[in-house]
A protein has these predicted regions:
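Charge-rich, low-complexity N-terminal segments
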Residues: 1-140
Length: 140
């Protein structure tokens, strides 16, 4: 059974090297576990959608909760799915500082990434729009 999980967290280290390390690790490990998804980052906040088998997604989320590179990890949305929305990416990436602010303002009060202040469904809609507007990089 496929599931989709959406969570937010705050980055402990916001350097480009730290973010690249997370992406590189994900792109190596995720194919082995049948995991796909995207990671958005901006303003020290991560918003990530992960898709795959129920056990694989649950195990990965448990690992993320214990990962010292993340703090304030919050589950935003979880659902069983019939097909993947982010199946083309072992871990796509979106640097929110490079996104047109009008996209962010469509889903939030301020032009910044803050999944803590909106519903999980709104955050998922933002990710879907970023995918539709080809804002996701790192297809692997």
């Amino acid at each position: 059974m496929l599931v989709r999980l959406l969570y937010a967290s705050r980055a402990v280290d916001t350097s480009s090297e730290a973010i690249e390390a997370i992406l590189s690790q994900s792109r190596l490990a995720n194919p082995v576990g049948g995991i796909t998804g995207i990671l958005c980052y901006g303003g020290g906040i991560f918003l990530q959608a992960i898709e795959g088998g129920r056990m694989a997604v649950s195990e990965l989320y448990g690992h993320i909760q214990k990962d010292l590179r993340h703090k304030d990890v919050v589950l935003l949305h979880y659902e069983e799915i019939s097909e993947r929305r982010f199946g083309g990416w072992t871990m796509g990436q979106v640097n929110m500082s490079r996104i047109n602010v009008s996209i962010l303002l469509k889903y939030a009060e301020r032009p910044e990434l803050d999944p803590y202040s909106v519903s999980g469904k709104v955050s998922l809609a933002l990710l879907e729009e970023l995918m539709a507007t080809a804002s996701i990089m790192g297809r692997a």
